[in-house]
């Protein structure tokens, strides 16, 4: 048992050299503080560039003045709106498409359409026309519920739809018409009947009109009666055939169905 006692003593001295390396850790903490000082001076040059921002705000005010004069030419076309209030005599009889084609009328002058002065700008003309037509159609829809007219508001204007079908007689008797044209015209007829509740399908009414015109099945057919057709046409309504009358916002670009 005596030789085991001496090796217990050399274990204690190596515990002492552990304490001194703890001291050199403190000095490196001091040099961290000085670099915090140079951060403050660069904050000063930020303030001067804020001053030149104010002067460019002044030239914005003068261009606001020339905007007012173009609003004046809208007032003169308000006078020809009064006569269209009379045509409220649509017949209550059901619509029946004619068996004979009606020849398309000559296209109106591009400047004056619906009694609007040609000197007015395109924008003022379209705005005035859209406002007056909306009022007239609201009156017709309220006062003549049994006329067979159905109205559908669209982004391009107003569409007047009837229960009349496309006049397929013209296509079947036209030389050179193919079976594909006849099938397309039949499909277009079904589309026109659904257009009042599905006027967004496949490009809306404008897309339907363009497809129908490309196929050649849309001719200028009569609508309800010649009296109503002439009155509506006087308001800038374009009869595109297949039982569809289309009102454009820009009356200078009226659609007249031609083969």
From Swiss-Prot:
Keyword Repeat recorded: yes
Region Disordered, residue ranges: 1-127, 174-203
Record's keyword annotation contains Repeat: yes
Region (15 X 7 AA repeats of S-P-P-S-T-P-V): 5-109
Compositional bias annotation for Pro residues: 1-108
Alphabetical keyword list: Merozoite, Repeat
Compositionally biased residues, Basic residues: 184-203
Sequence repeats: from-to residues: 5-11, 12-18, 19-25, 26-32, 33-39, 40-46, 47-53, 54-60, 61-67, 68-74, 75-81, 82-88, 89-95, 96-102, 103-109
Protein name: Merozoite surface protein CMZ-8
Source organism of this protein record: Eimeria acervulina
């Amino acid at each position: 048992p005596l030789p085991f006692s001496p090796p217990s003593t050399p274990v204690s001295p190596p515990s002492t050299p552990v304490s001194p390396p703890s001291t050199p850790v403190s000095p490196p903490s001091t040099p961290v503080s000085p670099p915090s000082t140079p951060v403050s001076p660069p904050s000063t040059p930020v303030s001067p560039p804020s001053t030149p921002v104010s002067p460019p705000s002044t030239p914005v005010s003068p261009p606001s003045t020339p905007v007012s004069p173009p609003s004046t030419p809208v007032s003169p076309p308000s006078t020809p709106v009064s006569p269209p209030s009379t045509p409220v005599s649509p017949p209550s009889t059901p619509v029946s498409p004619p068996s004979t084609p009606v020849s398309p009328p000559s296209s109106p002058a591009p400047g004056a359409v619906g009694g609007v002065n040609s000197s007015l700008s395109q924008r003022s003309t379209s705005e005035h026309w859209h406002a007056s037509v909306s009022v007239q159609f609201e009156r017709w829809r309220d006062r003549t519920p049994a006329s067979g007219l159905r109205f559908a508001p669209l982004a391009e204007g107003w569409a007047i739809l009837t229960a009349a079908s496309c006049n397929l007689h013209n296509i079947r008797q036209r030389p050179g018409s193919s079976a594909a044209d006849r099938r397309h015209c039949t499909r277009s007829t079904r589309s026109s009947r659904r257009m009042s509740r599905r006027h967004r399908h496949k490009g809306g009414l404008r897309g339907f009109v363009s497809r129908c015109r490309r196929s050649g099945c849309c001719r200028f057919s009569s609508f309800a009666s010649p009296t109503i057709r002439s009155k509506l046409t006087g308001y800038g309504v374009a009869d595109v055939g297949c039982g569809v009358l289309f009102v454009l916002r820009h009356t200078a670009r009226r659609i007249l169905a031609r083969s």
